[in-house]
Amino acid sequence: METHHIDFSTVLDVSALKAECEALAKRGLDKNEERSALLALLKKASQDGREEARRLLIADGSGLNCAHRISWLQDQIITVLYDLTVHHAYPKQAGVFSVTAVGGYGRDTLAPGSDIDLLFLFQPKPASETHKAVEFILYMLWDMGFKVGHATRSVEECIREAKSDMTVRTAILETRYICGNVALERELQARFDKEIVTNTGPEFIAAKLAERDERHRKAGDTRYLVEPNVKEGKGGLRDLHTLFWISKYYYHVRDPAELVKLGVLSKQEYRLFEKAEDFLWAVRCHMHFLTGKAEERLSFDIQRDIAAALDYNARPGLSAVERFMKHYFLVAKDVGDLTRILCAALEDQQAKATPGLTGVISRFANRSRKIPGTVEFVEDRGRIALANPDVFKRDPVSLIRLFFVADINGLEFHPDALKRVTRSLSLIDNDLRENEEANRLFLSILTSKRDPALILRRMNEAGVLGRFIPEFGKIVSMMQFNMYHHYTVDEHLIRAVEVLSEIDKGRAEDIHPLTNKLMPNIEDRDALYVAVLLHDIAKGREEDHSEAGAAVARKLCPRFGLSPKQTELVVWLIAEHLTMSMVAQTRDLTDRKTIIDFADRVQSLDRLKMLLILTVCDIRAVGPGVWNGWKGQLLRTLYYETELLLSGGFSEVSRKERAEAAAEALEHALADWSQKERKAYVKLHYQPYLLSVPLEDQIRHTQFMRESDKAGKVLATMVRTDSFHAITEITVLSPDHPRLLTVIAGACAAAGANIADAQIFTTSDGRALDTIHVSREFPDDADELRRAATIGKMIEDVLAGRKRLPEVIATRTKNRRKNKAFVIPPSVIITNSLSNKFTVIEVECLDRPGLLSEITAVLSDLSLDIQSARITTFGEKVIDTFYVADLVGQKISNENRRAYITARLKAVMAGEEDEMRERMPSGIIAPAATRGVAVEKSDTEKKAGSAA
């Protein structure tokens, strides 16, 4: 690419450097002192030049210019080294070999931390002195701190290897002469064009596209991952390089600008190419400068700094970093558009002249047949194509119809069709948006029984979805700066539709059986699909996105052809789309008022069913690993309790009767025990335990308590893995203590376990039977059981006083660099309206090891009795909810006391010094000496935990 317009004069004074090096060389390069001085001189020139390139990057903002400047700087240093080598160190080697740049360096671009790839071209049968001369150059570069990838070959060897090795072929395609024998480089290029490139275009293109697909698969096959790889990811620099390789190989161009003259790209599309390349290079160069290494993943911990370096500012509803990342993803989308346009051009302009190309690039072939029911489109080898180039101009509705016809016929898209869609987006105006037929077709696509997400994704990538629904266009490529959401908002919405389609087809039974069961009975399927697509459409606005999204839906639904009743249903679903998830994960589902309040918001069984399905789709579409069986269990519990209330089967009387029935069932299950033992152990459990804990767990717990008592254990733990719910259960039996949860939480933090939930129960004889669920870490049960046993042992050691809590937590100093990128102001909400019996305290802040232990320690220090707790993490954010009472069992009603509780909690959440941190309890159970060896798990207990 041409770089003549760039001023390199401030990057390096070449004449001065050469003069200083020459003076040192005359003293003899074989002396260590002179060699060290030369190294220091060249190293300083390189560092100063790169620092100047960084300064100019900040000044002019051009990433491509920065990459050119660093490449030019490297050229000068290598040229100086070559001259010193052939004129002083090995004077007989002048003109014997050639130094050429390959890879990105061969394109005359170099990132600050990138490797330097060199090809040394030799004459056949080079002398040993030639190899020594090359080694001298390489060792100097290595000693300067550069990572140098190199090859030494003759022209003949290059040609021979290029015939069989596509990597070598690509490297030679990008060679650029730096210094030495220029005739060797010219010979290589001439022979390469004649012996390798001629008639091998289809082969090369197929290999490069296959290589691209594999690269995407490894990097994450979506351009909407919120921590993208700028170099290797979809829509990144390597995709642009692939376009350049194909263009250079097939069209014999040295610069992408020549593609405009050939009619492959329009002037506007070439400008898009230039802007995309310059932007991606700016991001990459800033990343390398910031991290001091070849960092290619745009991770959370550097995104904010890169946004600042590129001068992005916050706007209402979007932070500076979110605006920067939205621009990034829009550029990645542009790269995808350019890829499709180039593929279309390869077929349209070259396939007839080169029939061999047709079977290689995406099954290209110049054959087509009619598609029943349409005259606008034809089928071309399993792909939908345009019957005439002016189809869209004649009838803009065909811009929507194209996707509808592709869906009902199960066709892929011809790249030329998508190219023409992209070039016809201006035809999507208000008239088309209000067109009844266009909206009918769109609703049919959205609610298709086939693969609606695939078609919606194609519409989005082609730019149609954002033009047809401008409100959707506002969230295209929008990311949310947090560790919870894995994709951009538009990709999340399309993935949510994909999840709904799976449920609709009956394919979700293993993941969430209840939604699978409910879906066939949903009365308004269309409304549900619309709600799923639109539920986050108002993200990025100042106002609450649920309320704003409901307002957007009220406007869009009639346009889509929905009735007033359907519209109101969609509006309600979007307004409430977070409610069920938050209630299930942050509220005590055994508290009757939780269910009553939720049922008051839902009001009907139909709404309840649809809200559950929408909630499941939303959570599962957030990203891999976010959904798990434990969340599914919470949602099922909330659903069934609410269903019971809405259908009239929920009352205080029924709760008492259900508790009595549960006690009878437990007693019956222990039929092989003596009657005295059965009654004694069943009477240990209060109503909340009997109503909320499944019978099989009650049986396990009761057997566990009996075995512990027989063994004389005051303290015991039992572990069990649960692969379906993706959690591991640790049950702790201990004398009750106000700080028991603090110790358990702290011990878990010290063992590196993430608590997903805590069930706190007391028995009538003054013991605590606490069950904690920790997120599963290992897929294999045996590995997970060993981990759980380690956590259980840690809990026992801290409770027994063998280890101190502050010390063991301090050992968990795992670097949470990513979390440091986020700012979440500590929030404390104390309310008496969510429970009839307890005060509910909800805290929200940035997560860190030991946080739950510190919070519960403060609550205990404030004489608050924790009755139940819900621990929920959303990426880097934690929302913990505690149901508490004072020491006499009353709610916290005094305003001054509530204010003091809030202040203490906010202080510890913010990481400020708190007197409780050093006074965290340890050894709250009687010393082991008074209890024998009961704290250690027996073989029987381990087997019981494993078998369970």
Curated annotation (Swiss-Prot):
HAMAP family: PII_uridylyl_transf (MF_00277)
Protein name per UniProt: Bifunctional uridylyltransferase/uridylyl-removing enzyme
SUPFAM superfamilies: ACT-like, HD-domain/PDEase-like, Nucleotidyltransferase, Nucleotidyltransferase substrate binding subunit/domain
Keyword Plastid part of the UniProt annotation: no
Annotated stretches, region: Uridylyl-removing: 373-728
UniProt keyword annotations, A-Z: Hydrolase, Magnesium, Multifunctional enzyme, Nitrogen fixation, Nucleotidyltransferase, Repeat, Transferase
UniProt EC number: 2.7.7.59, 3.1.4.-
Family: Belongs to the GlnD family.
Needed co-factor(s): Mg(2+)
Any one Gene Ontology molecular-function term assigned to this protein's record: [protein-PII] uridylyltransferase activity
ACT domain location: 729-810, 840-921
Cross-referenced PROSITE patterns: ACT (PS51671), HD (PS51831)
Positions of disulphide bridges: none
Gene that encodes it: glnD
Region of interest (Uridylyltransferase), residue spans: 1-372
Record-linked Pfam families: ACT, GlnD_UR_UTase, HD, NTP_transf_2
General function of this protein: Modifies, by uridylylation and deuridylylation, the PII regulatory proteins (GlnB and homologs), in response to the nitrogen status of the cell that GlnD senses through the glutamine level. Under low glutamine levels, catalyzes the conversion of the PII proteins and UTP to PII-UMP and PPi, while under higher glutamine levels, GlnD hydrolyzes PII-UMP to PII and UMP (deuridylylation). Thus, controls uridylylation state and activity of the PII proteins, and plays an important role in the regulation of nitrogen fixation and metabolism.
Regulation of this protein's activity per its record: Uridylyltransferase (UTase) activity is inhibited by glutamine, while glutamine activates uridylyl-removing (UR) activity.
Domain notes: Has four distinct domains: an N-terminal nucleotidyltransferase (NT) domain responsible for UTase activity, a central HD domain that encodes UR activity, and two C-terminal ACT domains that seem to have a role in glutamine sensing.
The keyword Transferase is annotated on this UniProt entry: yes
Domain HD: 489-605
Source organism (scientific name): Rhizobium tropici
